[in-house]
Structures are given as C-alpha cells and as structure tokens.
C-alpha cells in the first residue's frame, strides 16, 4: 500500500508539522466561502450598518471560540476530526460522524463545481462566446480534485495563490464602489431595513454562526499539521475573524449596490470580466478542495482505504452529478448540516471533560453508546427547538448528555485500545515538557 502522507489512519508526526504562515493561508482559504457572501447579502439587506458589524463580530466570536477549541485538540493529538471521533464514538461507531461529515462535503463539492461553471458560461455568453456547461464543469472538477488528491501541500500552494487574489480583487472592488458612488457611505450609514428583509440582532447572529459552524467542525483535519497549539489556535481564530468577516462584507456591499451576492459578479458588473472569473474560480477552489479532502479522510476512516484514492472517487462523483446537485440538493445539504455541530460538541466534551486528566489517552471505548445517544438528542434539539440559536442549542445538549451518559454507561472504563486499532499518540515535545514540569511540581 502506498505511503499515507495525509495520515488518514494515524496522528501527524512532529517532523511533518508546519509553521504559522503555511497554516494561516490554508485556514484563510478555508474561510473564503461563497455561502458566507450569500449570508452577507441577507445581513446587509436586513440590518443597519452598526448592527451588521455587531452581528458579524458576535457571530465570529462564537465561531472563533468553537473552531479554536477544535484546533487546540487537533494540535495536541495530531489527529483528524474522524480519528478524534474514535475516542468518543469508538472505532466502529466513528463511522457515523465520519459519514455525517463526508457525505455533505461531497454534495457541496458538486454544488461548488456547478457554482463555478454556470457563471463562466454566462460571462462568456455575454461576450458572444457559446460554451457547453460540461466544459467548465469537467475542468473545474479536475482542478479541485487534483489539489485535494495531493493533500495538505497542494492545499497550501493553492491557498498561497488564491488568498491574495481574492483579498486584492475584493478589496479593489469594494474601493471602486465608493469611488464610483460618492454617496455610498451615506447610503450605508442611513440605510434602514424594511418589511420582510428586516432582521433582529439575534436572528442575524444565528445566521452568522450557521453559515460556517458545520464546515468549522472539520477544522482539525487541517490544523493537526500545526507545529504547536499556539499556531493552531491563533491561525484558526484570526482566519475566522478576517476571512469570514470579509466574505460577509463583500456580500453586503454587492447586494446593496449591485443586487448580487458574489464578489465575482460585482467585479463583472464593474467591467472587470477576467478578474471576476479568476476571483470566482479561486474562491470556490479553496473551499472545494478542502471539502473533498475532508470527505476523503472521513471515508478512509470508514473503509480503511487510502484517502487519496477515495478523493478521486468522490471528486468524480461530485463532478458527474454537479448540475443535478446544484439544482436539487442544496436544501437537503442544509438539513444534513444541522447534524454536524453536535459531533463537535461531543469531541470537546470527551477531550476537555472526560479525558481532562489524561488528554493524550487514545483509549477507544468498546461501547460508543454514550456518544451516539448524545448526538441523537443534540440533533433532535437542533432541528426542533425553535428558541435561541439552533446549532448552539444542539451542541450544548449533546455536550451535557455525553458527559452524563459516560458516567451512566461506564464510558472509558470499558475501553479497549489495541495498538493497531487506536490512533497513535501525537509527538509533541512541548506537551511532554509540560507534563514533566507538572510531575516536578
């Protein structure tokens, strides 16, 4: 079997860990998400400018705290979200969260391929060039699959090119809005939402959180490559504040002045066709290759097959069904995404509460019942309780019930951790040094 450079079945060894900038561009590219621009348009049309910035700030504070906690766990262990799930759901039981995480990501990959292809066909048609939709679909699918196939190094290279391109293109476009519209700031400052568009602050914060909390659960798949906890947590927190906030801002400005929710369409409306296509492609690319990478890791945990071959299969399926997924599957994918946040809450409960005295323990419970029951209850609450923030409601309930059920059912007291089944312990010298200091004390 070929060497697994993505460590889909084990922890990332210390010598393969990466520094701040390599991790930062990957995480920033991860947060450059087109769906966040759609949410930004909704927020921009539904809030005053002061409440818009407050909602984005509060929402990203919560998202940043959640993803930073997952980043801390990943860098401490060197494990992907799927291998972290083994520690609470058990080896067989971890197939459940892996499937919940992997299947929507394959679907979103297909949607992203179509999202890239349709505007390109439209742009070319406006220039008098007829193009069959399957040409950009196939090209996009191959591009996005290739970087996911080659793993974290390829994801880093794509992000190194894409992140500056998106930031410069979006920043220039926003600046052009104010240059072309002298009263733009007054328009923003004096804007008052009316009718069905108006949002309460709590609803706006819920939208901000909901736009990325499911994707954010996959954070460990990337930051497990960070050299230490400080790099993992800081790059994650900063990326969510900068990347997510920029996407909301671009969406709000585009929606208000150009009646579109995507910065690439704004660039085209401003007469910048080629930059628009470039920004569109890069913006979707940095999200899609990450989605496919995560789905490959999830299926590798379920099947035991190498991640890179599973990425090829998932990428091929997503490309073939891209148009169908785009037209019929978005609503279904959004429903599936409500199943994901309770998984992250259970992983945190296991790491910070159940294993708090021995976070390096890779004991795999012989009985995954506590995690499965807690996930089921958290998912039901997230879907049917209408008060507060749905995703957070589900997470809080799943967290509490997991800790409770571990006490009721015995949890790790029934653990079995054969070396060939349990994920290997992460090699992190800084952790060992801390442990020695504690022993001396």
Predicted regions: what they are:
Residues 14-17, 344-419:
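C-terminal membrane-solvent junction of multi-pass transporters and transport-like membrane proteins
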Residues 117, 135, 139-177, 236-240, ...:
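Membrane-interface loop-to-helix entry segments
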Residues 26-30, 98-99, 113, 125-150, ...:
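Transmembrane alpha-helical segments of multi-pass small-molecule transport proteins
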